[in-house]
């Protein structure tokens, strides 16, 4: 049975659906039934079978297009942003159309920012494929790109209209990417979710072995923690700053390593220790 969490205030609330497989016609098509065209943004690191699943659902139902970014933080750039915006313009997208972010945090961030700024805002859907993006970046509405002076310096707050979390995607993650996501999970346990802390402590082997039912509970508790905070403080003017625990040093560590050899989650873990 799917787990459903509602995030945000009445004027901007959206649903997060968590299950082994949320990529169904019922979930996706019912949400975009009034949309005319769809641009799927993904990257070269996302298994093609996931993209094919989305395309199969949209086939014969919606006019869709695909934009594939190069895998990695370097794609969260002004150049990639302009390329996507020009593609939307060339395809004559308007406010009756939407975007789908199929990938990790980089894909979600740049897609959300493009959606926020094209025609001053079109809808977008998050389909996160990594643990880190499932528990963190797909929820809360932060979208951004990087510039040479720093990470996430150009961006906006833009909530998705829907988040579909497939726990089965975690089966294909590398060990390094999976552990990176756990860094953000541990953060949520440390900033006040006692149930999540106990869940992690009591089920460490099951989590390590990627038992999906346990992982779905871990994801749910992580998102509940974030949801409560971002609903109260949508624009990071107060309590939301607690979500940056570990990130001040973490971002510096990532930048020092030129975003190579160390993942975001690993950097956050080190940042929390510091």
Language model features: what each stretch is:
Residues 106-113, 134, 251-252:
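Short glycine/serine/threonine-rich phosphate/pyrophosphate-binding segments
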Residues 1-98:
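ATP/NTP phosphate-donor binding region
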Residues 71-72, 102-104, 245-246:
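Glycine-rich beta-strand-to-loop/alpha-helix junction loops that act as flexible
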